[in-house]
Amino acid sequence: MASRFRVAGVTFDFWETLFMDTPQLDRRRDELRCQGLQENLTKLGVEVSFEDLANGLRESTPWLANIWKKGEQVSTLEQIRYIVNHATKNRQVLLSDPEALMRLEESYWSPSLTAPAKLNADAPKVLQQLRERDFKIGLICNTGRGPGHALRELMRREGVLDYFDATIFSDEVGYGKPETRIFLTAAKMLGLEPSEILHVGDNIENDVRGAQSAGMRTLLFEYEVPSGFREQPSLLALTRASDSNTSVKPDGRIKSLSEILNFID
C-alpha cells in the first residue's frame, strides 16, 4: 500500500511530466529554429548555411546541459550567439539593433508553439481533481530552448494554465532545478511551507534531489527516455545521464499522473 502524505499543495515538472516530448517533435523544432535563424540572418546580410547552423545547434546541446545541471541559466540570446558564432567560425555577426535581435529570438523560441510537446493525457483530470480538493497547484520548470512565456502560452492553449496558482520558469527567476531556491520560490508563491508540498517530476536529480533539499515530499514519475532521444545528443538524454548512478530515493514512484491521488490525504 502506498504511503500517504498530508500536504496542501502539489507542484509539477513540465517536461516529460506535464507535457511529453518525442524525438520527432524535438527534431522538427530544431529544423524550424535553424530555418528561422537562417532567414533572419540573411535579412541582416549574413550568409550562413542551414547545415552550419544545425551543426552549431548540435554543438550547443552538451554546452547547455552542463550549464543547466548546475542550476545556472542561459538566455535565448546567449544561446543564439553560441550557435551563430559556431556556425560562422566566430565571426561577430549579431548586431545590437533591438528589432533585429527580437526577430532572431522569436525564430528561436516560436517552434515551442508551432511544433509543441503534447499534454500528458492524464493531466486535465488530475488537475481538476486536485482543484476540487482545494490543493494549491504549482509548476516548476527548467525552460531549455523554449522560454517561460512560450511554455505558459502552450499551457493556456491546452486549457490547463488556469489550474495553476503559480508557474515558475527558470529563465524568468534566473536559476533552475536542482537548486534549492527554485523550490523555495515555488513554496513562497503558493503561500505554503515546503513540507506541505508534494513535488512530481521525472528527473531523479533535478526533481527529487532538488525538491528534497528544500524539504518537500517527492514522487518520481517513471518515464523512460525514448530511444530516439538516446541516439542523438538531446538535452533530455544528457540531463538524465546520471539518474542510474544516484543514491537519491524518492518518497514514492508513479507511472501515471492519476496515481498521485493515491499518495495524498
What are these regions (language model features)?
Residues 4-128, 132-133, 148:
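N-terminal helical cap/lid subdomain that shapes the substrate entry/recognition surface
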Residues 1-10, 14, 20, 27, ...:
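Asp-based, Mg2+/Mn2+-dependent phosphohydrolase catalytic module
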